[in-house]
């Protein structure tokens, strides 16, 4: 999982969600696209 200051969907399968107050991107097609917003 990548931790980035700004998270963006990388493909059509990417979903932007909010978990425990953190913005995350999950992707069923490519797990490399997983991201979490952080410092």
From Swiss-Prot:
PROSITE patterns found in the cross-reference section: RIBOSOMAL_L36
GO cellular component assignments: cytoplasm; ribonucleoprotein complex; ribosome
Keywords: Ribonucleoprotein, Ribosomal protein
UniProt key word Magnesium: no
Pfam families in the cross-refs: Ribosomal_L36 (PF00444)
Keyword Ribonucleoprotein attributed: yes
Disulphide bonds in the chain: none
Gene Ontology MF term list: structural constituent of ribosome
Gene Ontology biological process terms in this record: translation
Family: Belongs to the bacterial ribosomal protein bL36 family.
Protein name per UniProt: Large ribosomal subunit protein bL36
Species whose genome carries this gene: Oenococcus oeni (strain ATCC BAA-331 / PSU-1)
Primary gene name: rpmJ
